[in-house]
Amino acid sequence: MAVKWTGGHSSPILCLNASQEGLVASGAEGGDLVVWGEDGTLLGHTCFQGAEDVTNVLFSPSCPTKLYASHGETISILDVRSLKEPLDDFHVNEEEINCLSLNETENLLASADDSGTIKILDLENKKISRSLKRHSNICSSVAFRPQRPQSLVSCGLDMQVMLWNLRKARPLWITNLQEDETEEMESPQSPGQLLNPALAHSVSVASCGNVFSCGAEDGKVRIFRVMGVKCEQELGFKGHSLGVSQVCFLRESYLLLTGGNDGKIKLWDVSSEIEKKHKSPTKHTHRKKTKRAAYTKQGGGTHASVTGEDEHGKILPKLSIEHGEKVNWLLSTKIKGYRNILVADQTSCISVYPLKEF
């Protein structure tokens, strides 16, 4: 069963982030932002003026007390030791912000919004350095690539995934998930796909910087590799029976967490699929070879395979949790030395699941 962190929010939690020191921040509907200790104790709370939903929170890696938060069309920078007044506010987006991403050198902050625009904020000069406009619908997720501070990936409800280099105002590469269904997908296009189009909800880049994942409304998880100025789809599989709301690579590995509107949380090891095509291991990838099967029980239990594939070569999750609520946000972080999964859903509490096997 999951441990529940309660008492911080009274409305559904939309986003989570963790600092390197073990602090956790959560943002909720109605403008609420809470900072927690690693044992779930409430350390701080604020409610932004205007009571607009807090859609993203992001700790600064270099300054663990600094926190970025998006609410409505505003980005606020806060000191977690004193949340009452923001250190700075930026009004750079014209519509509600859905996602924030900080580059590795921490001089640029990307904010993706409902208009489909990605604004690039120069944090040193406190001004917009780029405005990236190519998505024709809501831009739901954006992520800078590790080790490449001028490069990012984005996805949106226009079913498009894009690769950007900030030296150019237009994307280097675009794919339409609905049009680009390949033979790699396990099943041919079915009438159900018209009911569940491949609206893209979430992207996550692995620590190597070259491999990224995208989760979409059609229930599929897609893995791409950046090949210079373009990308290739390495893998695509049906991960959830309903839309994939969250994808999240664990640090320094090709272990991928996914969360869905079907109330399930799954952990996949996609390393073997990636390494089949690229024999040399990717830089900065440290993978533990585990043969242990995970456990299974209802209501926060798991079901997993010992190996990553069944007899038909179909990829299987290493871990499957019956969470029971639509997943709004997933986070993997170490708490007291052990890796855990933190989950935000339609409730006002955070669920914490141990991930000791991995």
UniProtKB/Swiss-Prot annotation:
WD repeat coordinates: 8-46, 92-131, 134-174, 195-234, 239-278
Keyword terms: Repeat, WD repeat
Composition-biased stretches (Basic residues): 278-294
Domain of life the protein comes from: Eukaryota
Pfam family, one: WD40
Statement: the UniProt record of this protein carries the keyword Transferase: no
Spans annotated as Disordered: 278-309
Similarity comment: family membership: Belongs to the WD repeat WDR53 family.
Protein name: WD repeat-containing protein 53
Species for this entry: Bos taurus
This protein's encoding gene: WDR53
